[in-house]
Amino acid sequence: MSSTQKPADVTAERRSHWWWTVPGCLAMVLLNAAVSYGIVRLNAPVTVAFNMKQTVDAFFDSASQKQLSEAQSKALSARFNTALEASLQAWQQKHHAVILVSPAVVQGAPDISREIQQDIARRMRAEP
């Protein structure tokens, strides 16, 4: 009789492990999904809009009011271009963002034009 009881004990032991294995695996899958979601959410870049045309037009309007020679005008344009690129790059790196020009955005992306224009002005004042 002991030989017939032994397989029953092994089967009962396996069932006991089954009840702990399934919830444990489900918990691991849920934890893995939560960690994966968090990693993706933290690393996903933010999309913002920048009105390049308005910024460049404002610069050229301001520059046209000054009496500058052609060489001075070229130097000022080069400084503006350098300040514009540096400002956009710095903002993009600081905020882990994708910057799109305003016409490419239908809605929903915050506009950073004013912030970039202020940074360009600060950079232009700082450079000789």
From Swiss-Prot:
<keyword id="KW-1003">Cell membrane</keyword>
<feature type="transmembrane region" description="Helical">
    <location>
        <begin position="18"/>
        <end position="40"/>
    </location>
</feature>
<dbReference type="InterPro" id="IPR014115">
    <property type="entry name" value="TrbI_Ftype"/>
</dbReference>
<comment type="function">
    <text>May influence the kinetics of pilus outgrowth and/or retraction. Overexpression phenocopies the deletion mutation; i.e. causes resistance to F-pilus-specific phage and CdiA-CT toxin.</text>
</comment>
<dbReference type="Pfam" id="PF09677">
    <property type="entry name" value="TrbI_Ftype"/>
</dbReference>
<keyword id="KW-1133">Transmembrane helix</keyword>
<protein>
    <recommendedName>
        <fullName>Protein TrbI</fullName>
    </recommendedName>
</protein>
<keyword id="KW-0614">Plasmid</keyword>
<dbReference type="GO" id="GO:0005886">
    <property type="term" value="C:plasma membrane"/>
</dbReference>
<keyword id="KW-0472">Membrane</keyword>
<keyword id="KW-0997">Cell inner membrane</keyword>
<keyword id="KW-0812">Transmembrane</keyword>
